[in-house]
Each structure stands twice: as structure tokens, then as C-alpha cells.
């Protein structure tokens, strides 16, 4: 599926709460099936290896009972590889909690075109991390977006 790239400022909310880096791979797979029922998932052992590689590269997971997000911090911007939530308000709460943790004021979010979060916002872009990174990348590394 094509992707939508959304760049937005993150409003400050000192009361936004979420937990960080506590989402197990088993729970991540469960949540993916809830939010993206048609997604293709690797076996749990392979997902463990991919998540380990991503954590080593600085990935952070923000989650609460209404959604989750996987992101890297780059300067003043949180770059979300994946954001899934019950609705826009729940997604905003995840963004705000991540802002309070990192101090970053902006978000760059990749959404699957069929996701209903921030419907109609953002611009359409090609599939995969090529659009996300904006530069060549080694194809021997884990390619996380292929899993959605």
C-alpha cells in the first residue's frame, strides 16, 4: 500500500501519559492485528530479532491502552515509522507524551494510506523507508515497513 507522510507540530500537554519501551513483541503483534487486520507478520522469533536491531539503532516505543507508536528522535522531530491508535485524539496523546519525554516539538509520521488516523492530511508518497529516509539505504538491513 502507498503511504501518507504527515508533518505536524506537537501540542504540549503535561498531563499526557504513556509508557515507553514496555511493549513486548507478542503484544506488538497482537496490536498490529487489531489496527491493521490485513497485515503480514513474521513469526515472533523473527520479530524479536528485528525489534532488537531497531532498539540498537535508537528506536523508542510509546504506548498506552488506546494505541502505540514506533519512533526515532532526530533533532527537534520525532520520526514515526508506525503510529496506530483508536482515533486522532488517542494518537495526539501518544505524540504529546513523546514530546514531554524528548522535548521534540514536531512529528513526521508515516501512515498507511488505508489508515483512518488524520484522514485527508499529509501527502501521498511511495512505499517504504526510501521516502522516510530520503536517501539510499542498505538493503541487507531489517526493512520494518515491509511488515505492514
List where the protein language model places each region.
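Active-site/acyl-donor-binding loops of N-acyltransferases
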Residues: 1-14, 84-88, 96-148
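Amide-forming acyltransferase catalytic core, primarily the GNAT-like/NAT-type
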Residues: 2-82
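Sequence-level detector for tyrosine residue identity
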Residues: 35, 55, 68-72, 89, ...
Amino acid at each position: 500500500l502507498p503511504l501518507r507522510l504527515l508533518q505536524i507540530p506537537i501540542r504540549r500537554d503535561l498531563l499526557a501519559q504513556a509508557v515507553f519501551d514496555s511493549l513486548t513483541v507478542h503484544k506488538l503483534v497482537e496490536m498490529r492485528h487489531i489496527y491493521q487486520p490485513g497485515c503480514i507478520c513474521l513469526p515472533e522469533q523473527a520479530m524479536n530479532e528485528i525489534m532488537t536491531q531497531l532498539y540498537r539503532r535508537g528506536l523508542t516505543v510509546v504506548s498506552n491502552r488506546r494505541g502505540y507508536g514506533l519512533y526515532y528522535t532526530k533533532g527537534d522531530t520525532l520520526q514515526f515509522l508506525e503510529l496506530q491508535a483508536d482515533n486522532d485524539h488517542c494518537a495526539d496523546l501518544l505524540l504529546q507524551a513523546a514530546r514531554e519525554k524528548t522535548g521534540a516539538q514536531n512529528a513526521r509520521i508515516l501512515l498507511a494510506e488505508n489508515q483512518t488516523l488524520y484522514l485527508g492530511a499529509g501527502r501521498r508518497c511511495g512505499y517504504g523507508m526510501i521516502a522516510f529516509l530520503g536517501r539510499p539505504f542498505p538493503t541487507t538491513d531489517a526493512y520494518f515497513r515491509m511488515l505492514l
